[in-house]
Design a protein with these regions (language model features):
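Residue-level recognition of tetratricopeptide repeat
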Residues: 30, 68, 75, 116, ...
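Short coil turns that delineate tetratricopeptide repeat
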Residues: 53, 57, 105, 138-139, ...
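Helix-start (N-cap) detector for alpha-helical repeat units in TPR-like alpha-solenoids
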Residues: 22, 56, 60, 108-109, ...
Length: 336
C-alpha cells in the first residue's frame, strides 16, 4: 500500500514539474521576445509547446508568439536577399497562425498577420481572403490598404483602386495612417493600370497633403516628385514648369534629387550619383534609378531604350517592392 502511495506521489510530482517547466518556458519565451532575442524566443516557445502540458489558452499564446517571431526573422532574411529563408520562416509563421485561427477564427489581428505573411510569400489569393475576413470584423482603412496591395500585386487593379477609394471615404480613423499615403497607394495602382492622368492627380494630392509632415525626410520629396513627373509624362503632359518649381525644393546635386535634374535635362545619366558602397542601399538606389530611367524612356516613346534599364530593375529590386512590381508590368506590356 505504501509503495503504491509513493508511486502516486511521484507521478503527481512529475506532472507538476512538467507543467511548471512548460509554463516557465512560455514566460521565458515572452521575456526573450520583449528583449528582441528572436532565436531564443522561438526555441523557448517551441519547448513550451512540445512539453504537452500547456492549457489551451497558453498553447494559443505560444503559437501567436512563435508565429510573430518567425515573421520578424523573415524580414531580416528578406533584407539580405535570402528569399528561400524568408519564405520558409513565413511558412512556419503561417502554420502557427493557422493553428490559432482553427481555435479562434474571429481573431482579426491574427487574420491580418497571416494575410501579411501570405502576401510576402506571393500567395495573394489567400492573403486577400484573410484581409477580407478581417474587414468583416473591423472595417479599417489600413486593412483596406493591405488588401489593395495584394489585389494590386496580382494585377486586379480595379479592385485595388476601389479599396483605396473606400479607405479615403471611410469614417474610421487609423492613427498610423495618413490620408496622403492612401492617395499614394491609389496612385500606384492607377499607374500600374496605365491610368496615368488619375495617378498624377493622386500623386499631386499626396504631395500637397504630405509635404509638411515629411519635411525632415530628405528621400520622400524627390521620390514623390519623380512619381508625379513620370505619371504626367506617361499621360503625355508637359509638366516642365511644375517640375522646375519643385526642383527648387530639393538638392538636385545629391541622390535622389539628381533624378529631378535628369528629368529636366540638367544632368546626364552618367553623371547621376553612383551607387552607394553599402550593399542594400546600393541595390535600392540602382533599383530606383533603373526603373525611373526606363519609365522616362517609355514616356518619350523609346521602348527599346527602356527595355534594358527596366530589365535591370527587375533583376536588382527586392521582390517585395513596388518597383519590382512595376518593372514586371512594364516588361509584360512590352511583349505585346
Amino acid at each position: 500500500m505504501m509503495r503504491l502511495l509513493f508511486v502516486a506521489v511521484a507521478m503527481v510530482l512529475c506532472i507538476t514539474g512538467a507543467q511548471a517547466a512548460g509554463s516557465a518556458d512560455l514566460k521565458a519565451a515572452q521575456a526573450a521576445a520583449e528583449k528582441g532575442t528572436g532565436d531564443e524566443a522561438i526555441q523557448l516557445f517551441t519547448q513550451a509547446l512540445t512539453a504537452g502540458d500547456l492549457s489551451a489558452d497558453d498553447q494559443l499564446t505560444a503559437r501567436k508568439g512563435r508565429g510573430r517571431e518567425y515573421s520578424a526573422k523573415s524580414l531580416i532574411a528578406d533584407a539580405f536577399n535570402r528569399q528561400d529563408d524568408g519564405k520558409r520562416l513565413r511558412d512556419n509563421a503561417i502554420a502557427d497562425f493557422s493553428a490559432v485561427l482553427s481555435a479562434k477564427p474571429d481573431d482579426a489581428a491574427i487574420l491580418i498577420e497571416r494575410g501579411q505573411d501570405y502576401h510576402m510569400n506571393q500567395q495573394f489569393d489567400p492573403a486577400i481572403a484573410d484581409f477580407s475576413a478581417a474587414l468583416k470584423l473591423n472595417a479599417s482603412p489600413s486593412i483596406l490598404l493591405q488588401r489593395a496591395a495584394s489585389l494590386r500585386a496580382k494585377g486586379a487593379y480595379d479592385a485595388a483602386i476601389a479599396d483605396c477609394t473606400a479607405a479615403l471615404a471611410s469614417d474610421a480613423h487609423d492613427a498610423n495612417l495618413d490620408v496622403w499615403d492612401i492617395h499614394n497607394e491609389r496612385g500606384y495602382a492607377e499607374f500600374l493600370a496605365a491610368r496615368y492622368d488619375a495617378a498624377a492627380a493622386d500623386f499631386d494630392k499626396a504631395l500637397e497633403l504630405g509635404a509638411s509632415s515629411r519635411a525632415d525626410d530628405v528621400l520622400w520629396l524627390p521620390y514623390q516628385i519623380a512619381w508625379l513627373h513620370l505619371a504626367h509624362a506617361r499621360a503625355g503632359q508637359d509638366d516642365t514648369k511644375q517640375l522646375e518649381g519643385l526642383a527648387g525644393k530639393v538638392n538636385v546635386k545629391q541622390w535622389p534629387g539628381t533624378l529631378i535634374g535628369y528629368f529636366l535635362g540638367q544632368i546626364k545619366l552618367e553623371d547621376i550619383s553612383g551607387a552607394s558602397n553599402h550593399g542594400a542601399m546600393g541595390r535600392a538606389r540602382e533599383c530606383n534609378l533603373s526603373l525611373f530611367v526606363g519609365e522616362d524612356a517609355l514616356a518619350k516613346g523609346n521602348r527599346e531604350q527602356a527595355r534594358q534599364p527596366i530589365l535591370r530593375a527587375r533583376e536588382v529590386c527586392n521582390i517585395h517592392t513596388l518597383q519590382y512590381l512595376v518593372a514586371g508590368a512594364e516588361l509584360d506590356r512590352m511583349k505585346n
